[in-house]
Amino acid sequence: MAIDLGCHVGCASPETKQEETADPTAAPVVVDDVEAAAGGRRPGDGGGVNYVARAQWLRAAVLGANDGLVSVASLMVGVGAANGTRRAMLVSGLAGLVAGACSMAIGEFVSVYAQCDIQAAQIERARGGKDADGGEEEEELPSPTMAAVASALSFAAGAALPLLAGGFVRPWAARVAAVCAASSLGLAGFGVASAYLGGAGVARSGVRMLVGGWLAMAVTYGVLKLFGMHGV
């Protein structure tokens, strides 16, 4: 009887040891899965940087700078086609800078604020009306004010490039050439920067930005030149 009992104990002990050794290995996998499902934030991953809010104002800054450069350069070239005076081109470029910066800021503020309302309502529904862990989730929402300021400042910075390059040049041909040259350099720079940040092809992005800017300036110049020729 003692031999049989020892045999049963000896036969059962390896399985018990296997279960004891298997449990510690299974627990970290479950913890890792829970951490991954919670958002992928770990102590060594970025130090808790809020990339959602950063991407929001970075996108607004890039779009604002590109819009400011293309719109003001096209406006100055178009006005120069109809009215070749330096004052007309300078005033039109300055008006485009101020109006465009205000428009971009207001539009970005309204759109981001609407996005925040939608995300906040979604978070509230997911929490089921509870206030637990609400502070951490609310911090992940993008800031409408930051996006509006970034959009306005970037638009003004992009618009200032063609304005300063051609607004104070007296000869008409040199003025238009300066605006086009400064705009081309700025467009190429924005294309390369956006491609580098996004991990895309640098050359293709730069060419795409250049072609788009040249097309906008050419269309504006052609339309206003047509109006100027007919005395409108």
From Swiss-Prot:
Residues 1-59, 111-148, 197-208 are cytoplasmic. Keywords: Ion transport, Iron, Iron transport, Membrane, Transmembrane, Transmembrane helix, Transport, Vacuole. GO terms for cellular component: membrane; vacuolar membrane. The keyword Transport applies. The chain crosses the membrane at residues 60-80, 90-110, 149-169, 176-196, 209-229. The keyword Iron applies. Belongs to the CCC1 family. This is Vacuolar iron transporter homolog 1.
